[in-house]
Amino acid sequence: MKHLRKCTALLLAVLMVFALAACGQKDDTAAVDKDLTVNVVSLNGTTGFGMAKLMADSKAGTAALNYSFTVETDPSNATAALVNGTADIAALPTNAAAALYNKTDGAVQVLALNTRGVLYVVTDGTESITSFADLRGKNVYVPVQNPTFIFQYLCEKNGLTVGTDITIDNTYAQPAELNTALASGEVHIAVLPEPMVTIARAANPDLTVALDLTAEWDKVAPAGSLVQGCVVVRKAFADAHPNEVKAFLDEYKASIEYLTAEPDQAGQMIEEAGIFAKAAVAAKAIPNCNVCFVSGADMQAPLTEFLTALSTVAPQSIGGKVPGDDFYCILK
């Protein structure tokens, strides 16, 4: 009888362990509200590339959350959606994220960095350019906004005074316009982002990449601090739905890892999602797009350093000041 009681007690203990494990699994599943619609805005181009696999999973019904995706060409549409509450999460240029944070008194926060530097100096072979010193006295065509601010900072760090030692020409304000002008031979030296570099070189085989501005940045600023793209979240949404935000980050990280591991398949997903028109071009450009996933405390130093650099040449581009610690959504 005593032996039987011991066996019974042991059996009950084992059953309790399995019961507790089952309860734990049930709680983890219940922690994510699949009835909640998470509204996400992606962008055309490299800032949106990392969202493609997640968008495909959502369409196939295999994503962890109930997503509603929108793809925008103009970042201002994404910021407007965040302000009016029709977007919960959005991909944005990092300077636009900082400007929105300052404008809304901290109503948005950065969840993760998704793109490092994507800018390159491209020439048509009529000029020999191997360093910033070779740009002295030259006219360089640069798209407006972030490309101009970044290039201006690099010029100044390399001892070139804009307007005196070098001319930054914004005649072709948008990358697509500049891409066409460069490929046709109207422009000889230009700063272009990927995937426009890939498109231009396919149209004109004489074009060459003279300078990788990410590598040039690392020579004059803290390495890894050229970070051009990110995803942000409305603070009110993050506060109300921390488990869903964590689930999004896990899926988004996996989506970005898939992009770099399977560029051909990812290129097709990018086209199908409406993030970029040509799958083959996207796939070819991916290795040069410096797509990344940096979240938590690891994202604060590089982004703060980048925004500090921008504040020295174009403080208005980040909303007038470098955001503080509350700019970063660091999940517990």
Predicted feature residues:
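Flexible hinge/capping segments at coil-to-helix
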Residues: 30-33, 124-139, 162, 239-243
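A bilobed periplasmic-binding-protein/Venus flytrap-type ligand-binding module shared by bacterial periplasmic
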Residues: 53-54, 119-129, 225-244, 295
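Pocket-lining segment of extracytoplasmic ligand-binding domains
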Residues: 95-96, 165, 174-269
